[in-house]
Regions:
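Solvent-exposed, flexible loop/coil residues
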Residues: 13, 33, 42, 58, ...
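Hydrophobic ligand-binding cavity/cleft-lining segments
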Residues: 1-43, 96-99
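A conserved amphipathic terminal alpha-helix motif
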Residues: 105-138
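Hydrophobic-ligand binding "helix-grip"
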Residues: 27-28, 53-99, 105-107
């Protein structure tokens, strides 16, 4: 299933990119995220893990993120409740305003996961983007 979101943030690209790229701070402002950590970071690659609680269901997933500074972050599932999950953040700056684009393509491992998480993922993704907008505007 493919989900696409975008938002305009009245902040410069560097500030917005740094907020999105600081996975270890997600637990402080991202809905449903109860723990977030960077497991490793080297050159343009980051391994990150998120623990989520969605409708009382706790789950976690780990991604390998290819970071192109101030341009994009490509995410690929390493471990989690999905058969696959690929995502991409893209950043575009226009006169000290940043447009963020988030694309997530995923398939749940089974019907229980699809029911519990999949049906909510569209709302979760919207909440996620709104959380980044709010955090950037602080």
């Amino acid at each position: 299933m493919l989900i696409k979101k975008e938002a305009i943030i009245l902040r410069d690209l560097e500030a917005v990119f740094n907020i999105v790229n600081r996975v270890d701070f997600y637990k402080n402002f991202v809905p449903y995220c109860i723990e977030s950590e960077i497991l490793s970071e080297e050159n343009e690659q980051m391994i990150a893990k998120l623990n989520l609680n969605i409708k009382g269901l706790s789950t976690s997933f780990t991604t390998k993120n290819l970071v192109k500074k101030y341009s994009s972050i490509d995410m690929q599932l390493i471990e989690g409740p999905f058969k696959y999950l690929d995502g991409k953040w893209e950043f575009k700056e226009i006169e000290n305003t940043t447009i963020i684009f988030l694309t997530i393509d995923y398939k749940a491992k089974n019907k229980l996961v699809e029911y519990a998480i999949g049906k909510s993922l569209e709302k979760i993704t919207t909440s996620l983007v709104h959380a980044f907008v709010k955090e950037a505007n602080k």
